[in-house]
Amino acid sequence: MEQNFLSVKGIRKSFGNVEVLKGIDLSLNKGDVLAIIGSSGSGKTTLLRCLNFLETPDEGSISVDGELLLDASDKHSLSDARIRRNRLHFGLVFQSFNLFPQYTVLQNLMLAPSLALKDEVKAIRKEKGRHAAHTYKVEQHAAIREKAKALLTRVGLAEKANAYPCQLSGGQQQRVAIARAL
């Protein structure tokens, strides 16, 4: 039997005395589509924030492709560095795309990976020196640029790489947001 790509078990989250998530379990296979619906205040956004490691559940676990990424009972899995690394497994596209108007489409796609790269470069500089860090930064920045261009091609916007969000239609902006999530 094929293992689930995403497995969520027993996710609970409370804010004060209000329990918002009450033991959520779900399993998804690759290619599955999930719609989360509910009334205002029912915990939809809180669940997504927990799945994206933007919120820490009080209880429960999250596994991706068989790898346990978070176990609320294991303090090691809740370390800041591990949570930041695990965030890279997920991308969300919300109704409002929040593209940065001062950046081109390509720059919008490259922003988050470039910011994550800064932490890596700092660690390499400390461990291996300035030259090694610079070399790594240049190589990784080129890889980020190429991946961003490939994603733009994938969503049919390669020709819009140097455009600004205000120059795109709403649908094109949404495709940029999808590429950014990927």
What are these regions (language model features)?
Residues Q3-L182:
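ABC family nucleotide-binding domain
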